[in-house]
């Protein structure tokens, strides 16, 4: 006589989960529980209604901060102070014909747009005061009043340009 194994069907319960049998969760990584209090988080919800979108048609793109109104002398000095605090070397460059983005020497898309600007004098190695940079900016504006002038900051350790912004534009731009 052959024996046939009996199978017993049980109903699976969806809410039953096997217990965790490994390491204790808090044994290696102590965790402090924090209360989720969202009342102290910053919010600009009230200001969103008054924001505007920069119109993309008919507007020339320059460098960093070019979407803003022209920077005042005080604002430019603060940007230069930031550059100097980061131990970057200030340098002035100017362009007489094309201060805006266009492609001449490179056709590939991306950050590099193929423009070459003329350096005003030499990079200001050892500069510690924004007034020195502002004096050079005034000299460059006097020599080339119809030029785009930008201030750039080089990191001479990493050998990269870290900041670049338009300091002066010709009239009508």
UniProtKB/Swiss-Prot annotation:
Listed transmembrane segments: none
Record has Plastid as a keyword: yes
GO CC, alphabetical: chloroplast
UniProt-recorded Gene Ontology molecular function terms: ribulose-bisphosphate carboxylase activity
Gene Ontology BP, a term: reductive pentose-phosphate cycle
Location in or out of the cell: Plastid, Chloroplast
The entry's keywords: Calvin cycle, Carbon dioxide fixation, Chloroplast, Photorespiration, Photosynthesis, Plastid, Transit peptide
Targeting presequence: 1-49
One Pfam family cited in the UniProt record for this chain: RbcS
Gene3D superfamilies, per the entry: Ribulose bisphosphate carboxylase, small subunit
InterPro entries noted in UniProt: RuBisCO_ssu, RuBisCO_ssu_dom, RuBisCO_ssu_N, RuBisCO_ssu_sf
Entry keyword ATP-binding: no
Additional notes on this entry: The basic functional RuBisCO is composed of a large chain homodimer in a 'head-to-tail' conformation. In form I RuBisCO this homodimer is arranged in a barrel-like tetramer with the small subunits forming a tetrameric 'cap' on each end of the 'barrel'.
Subunit and partners: Heterohexadecamer of 8 large and 8 small subunits.
Family: Belongs to the RuBisCO small chain family.
Protein task: RuBisCO catalyzes two reactions: the carboxylation of D-ribulose 1,5-bisphosphate, the primary event in carbon dioxide fixation, as well as the oxidative fragmentation of the pentose substrate. Both reactions occur simultaneously and in competition at the same active site. Although the small subunit is not catalytic it is essential for maximal activity.
This protein's name: Ribulose bisphosphate carboxylase small subunit, chloroplastic 1
Organism: Flaveria pringlei
